[in-house]
From Swiss-Prot:
Keyword Cell division appears in the UniProt entry: yes
Protein name: Probable septum site-determining protein MinC
Lineage: Bacteria, Bacillati, Bacillota, Clostridia, Eubacteriales
Source organism superkingdom: Bacteria
NCBIfam families: minC, PRK00513.1-6
Annotated keywords: Cell cycle, Cell division, Septation
GO biological processes: cell morphogenesis; division septum assembly; regulation of cell septum assembly
Subunit comment: Interacts with MinD and FtsZ.
Pfam families: MinC_C, MinC_N_1
Stated role: Cell division inhibitor that blocks the formation of polar Z ring septums. Rapidly oscillates between the poles of the cell to destabilize FtsZ filaments that have formed before they mature into polar Z rings. Prevents FtsZ polymerization.
Designated gene of the protein: minC
Record-linked InterPro entries: CAP/MinC_C (IPR016098), MinC (IPR013033), MinC_C_sf (IPR036145), MinC_N_1 (IPR055219), Septum_form_inhib_MinC_C (IPR005526)
HAMAP family membership: MinC
Family the entry assigns: Belongs to the MinC family.
Length: 215
């Protein structure tokens, strides 16, 4: 669980939000934090399904109704599914070797993509520069950033879950591959080495980029 009590991850249907009510002094504090986090990706989350993992015994029935109505109105979600929060077991499964990336037409961008700018290309996009916070990049294939990635990116936007997103410094506001979405946790120190994001078992995972592994 994230230190602020709200953890958001992508899934096949849309997004998962896990709430730790013990982190909040009131229902209103939790609702405000959840809306604040989801609002960062409102453009991506619109029309999707939110699965909300929460200890329902700690919330009044009227507050559950208020929570659902607030999220449907503020984020414009298609549906909200409540699930009773359970402790998750750590998975000891080894990560399968990723045996390559989708290849196709590639567009090279030799500049920094600044806040407010939006790039869209049906194939792969390689950016020789940075993607600043507030910028958006959408690609039908892979997105490779030879610099820092701090904006919002959507690879495989035609439904290709084999697409990947990689960057020298991977700190996206929103990261989406096909219809699977995730956002970066706040306040975590990022490693100073290249990373690659891909879809595995319906969720997005991030791994260090190892050259001999992806050749």
């Amino acid at each position: 669980m994230h230190k602020d009590g709200v953890l958001i991850k992508g899934n096949r249907e849309g997004i998962n939000a896990t709430i730790d009510m013990e982190k909040f002094s009131s229902f209103e504090d939790m609702l405000n934090m959840l809306i604040k986090k989801l609002s960062k990706g409102k453009h991506f989350y619109k029309g999707t399904t939110l699965i909300l993992n929460i200890n329902l015994s700690l919330i009044k029935k009227n507050d559950i109704k208020k929570l659902k109505e607030s999220l449907l109105n503020e984020i414009e979600l298609n549906e909200i599914i409540f699930e009773q929060l359970e402790l998750e077991e750590e998975s000891n499964k080894q990560t399968k070797i990723f045996n390559g990336v989708y290849e196709g037409k590639t567009k090279f961008i030799r500049r920094t993509v600044r806040s407010g700018q939006c790039l869209n290309y049906p194939g792969n996009i390689v950016i020789i520069g940075d993607v600043n916070s507030g910028a958006e990049v959408h690609a039908g294939g892979n997105i490779i950033v030879l610099g820092s990635l701090k904006g919002s990116v959507n690879a495989g936007n035609t439904g290709n879950k084999k697409s990947i997103i990689a960057a020298f410094l991977l700190e996206p506001e929103i990261l989406k591959i096909a219809d699977v979405i995730t956002i970066s946790p706040d306040g975590l120190e990022k490693p100073k080495y290249p990373e690659i994001a891909k879809v595995k078992d319906g969720t997005i995972i991030v791994e260090p980029y190892l050259a001999n592994k992806y050749i």
